[in-house]
């Protein structure tokens, strides 16, 4: 489907969970001849990341309202109005055929600006619980899509766009069938790390001894502390790194993952075809719990809410999973994934632009 001459504005910002799926769709449409620009904020990760991907970015001034004091809330209508005016001016200049909102504060004023100019608004919700911005924008959107069932009652479930190197991994049967030796446990705390994983997993390693080998991504500034924790537990042989640059290679190495359950993480693990122990971040709307639930229901994962994530519980769970069990879980994870999510979202963008 050629997009020659078509223009898309992607609205996404704040976190990788919003930005990376937007980039996947943007690159897919650029390859079809679309011209793509990005709407973001100058002080969040998209300001650096998007230009590195060869996409021009425009900025509006907006920030979140959650947890702000009374002064900030009173000033919010004026700030939103100003951001809406900025977004309108940017869109009048660029003249997009369609805008794609992937979440983050920037989507609110951006979506309203597009709607006020008669530009179709397409939304994608990455999480199992809809964010505040997308809840508002759904009322005026041309098309609403969701990664997991339940965020919106009637929205089409299309999965989360995932990086191509993860999608290109061999299927679980090819990757895991001949493996022997200790179970390979990949622990992923994200860029900021997860203190509960950093504190608990060295003690789990001590309980399991040589039945496991662990690669532990500790997060920024925590590598030495976590290495010391493994050494103190009598387990200095395990690998600890601050970051993992090549997640696809890490997934290919692993037999099982222990991690938080951000939307993109859950979707990547399903696409890779890996069993998981998910430890949802404790948030009042339990967003990460709802992200992980479909994989637990599919028999591909186990969820431990943070208070239940104890050394004994995790050690006994890992010890109880044979290689045969892990392979079955891996195949169920892959079966629950949506490998063509990027194409599905891109097709809806194309459809909205033509309507």
From Swiss-Prot:
The gene is murG. GO terms for cellular component: plasma membrane. It holds the Pfam family Glyco_transf_28. The keyword Nucleotide-binding does not apply. GO terms for biological process: carbohydrate metabolic process; cell division; cell wall organization; lipid glycosylation; peptidoglycan biosynthetic process; regulation of cell shape. Pathway: Cell wall biogenesis; peptidoglycan biosynthesis. Its main location: membrane. NCBIfam families: murG (TIGR01133). This is UDP-N-acetylglucosamine--N-acetylmuramyl-(pentapeptide) pyrophosphoryl-undecaprenol N-acetylglucosamine transferase. One of its GO terms (molecular function) is UDP-N-acetyl-D-glucosamine:N-acetylmuramoyl-L-alanyl-D-glutamyl-meso-2,6-diaminopimelyl-D-alanyl-D-alanine-diphosphoundecaprenol 4-beta-N-acetylglucosaminlytransferase activity. Belongs to the glycosyltransferase 28 family. MurG subfamily. Keywords: Cell cycle, Cell division, Cell inner membrane, Cell membrane, Cell shape, Cell wall biogenesis/degradation, Glycosyltransferase, Membrane, Peptidoglycan synthesis, Transferase. It catalyses: di-trans,octa-cis-undecaprenyl diphospho-N-acetyl-alpha-D-muramoyl-L-alanyl-D-glutamyl-meso-2,6-diaminopimeloyl-D-alanyl-D-alanine + UDP-N-acetyl-alpha-D-glucosamine = di-trans,octa-cis-undecaprenyl diphospho-[N-acetyl-alpha-D-glucosaminyl-(1->4)]-N-acetyl-alpha-D-muramoyl-L-alanyl-D-glutamyl-meso-2,6-diaminopimeloyl-D-alanyl-D-alanine + UDP + H(+). It is found in: Cell inner membrane. The keyword Cell cycle applies. It is a peripheral membrane protein. Signal peptide: none annotated. UDP-N-acetyl-alpha-D-glucosamine binds at residues 15-17, 127, 163, 191, 244, 263-268, 288. It comes from the Bacteria. Its EC number is 2.4.1.227. HAMAP family: MurG. Cell wall formation. Catalyzes the transfer of a GlcNAc subunit on undecaprenyl-pyrophosphoryl-MurNAc-pentapeptide (lipid intermediate I) to form undecaprenyl-pyrophosphoryl-MurNAc-(pentapeptide)GlcNAc (lipid intermediate II). Gene3D superfamilies: Glycogen Phosphorylase B (3.40.50.2000). It comes from Escherichia fergusonii (strain ATCC 35469 / DSM 13698 / CCUG 18766 / IAM 14443 / JCM 21226 / LMG 7866 / NBRC 102419 / NCTC 12128 / CDC 0568-73). It is an enzyme of class 2 (transferase).
């Amino acid at each position: 489907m050629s997009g020659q001459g078509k223009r898309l504005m992607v609205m996404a910002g704040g976190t990788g969970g919003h930005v990376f799926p937007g980039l996947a769709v943007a690159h897919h449409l650029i390859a079809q001849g679309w011209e793509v620009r990005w709407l973001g904020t100058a002080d969040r990760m998209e300001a650096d990341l998007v230009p590195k991907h060869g996409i021009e970015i425009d900025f509006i001034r907006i920030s979140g309202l959650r947890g702000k004091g009374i002064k900030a809330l009173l000033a919010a209508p004026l700030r939103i109005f100003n951001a809406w005016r900025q977004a309108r001016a940017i869109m009048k200049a660029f003249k997009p055929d369609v805008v794609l909102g992937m979440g983050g504060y920037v989507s609110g004023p951006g979506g309203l600006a597009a709607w006020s100019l008669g530009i179709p608004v397409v939304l994608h919700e990455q999480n199992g619980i809809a964010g505040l911005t997308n809840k508002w924008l759904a009322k005026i959107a041309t098309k609403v899509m969701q990664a997991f069932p339940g965020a919106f009652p009637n929205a089409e479930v299309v999965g989360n766009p995932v990086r191509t190197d993860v999608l290109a991994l061999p299927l679980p049967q090819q990757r895991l069938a001949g493996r022997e030796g200790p179970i390979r446990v990949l622990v992923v705390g994200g860029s900021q790390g997860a203190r509960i994983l950093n504190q608990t997993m060295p003690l789990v390693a001590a309980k399991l001894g040589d039945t496991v080998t662990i690669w532990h991504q500790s997060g920024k500034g925590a590598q030495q502390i976590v290495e010391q924790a493994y050494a103190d537990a009598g387990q200095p042989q395990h690998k600890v790194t601050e970051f993992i640059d090549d997640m696809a290679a890490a997934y290919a190495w692993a037999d099982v993952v222990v991690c938080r359950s951000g939307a993109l993480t859950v979707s990547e693990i399903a696409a890779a075809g890996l069993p998981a122990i998910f430890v949802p971040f404790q948030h009042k709307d339990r967003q990460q719990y709802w992200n992980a639930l479909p994989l637990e229901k599919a028999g591909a994962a186990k969820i431990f809410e943070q208070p239940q994530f104890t050394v004994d519980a995790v050690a006994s769970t890992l010890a109880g999973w044979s290689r045969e069990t892990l392979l079955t879980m891996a195949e169920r994870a892959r079966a629950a994934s949506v490998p063509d999510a990027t194409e599905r979202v891109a097709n809806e963008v194309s459809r909205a632009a033509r309507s």
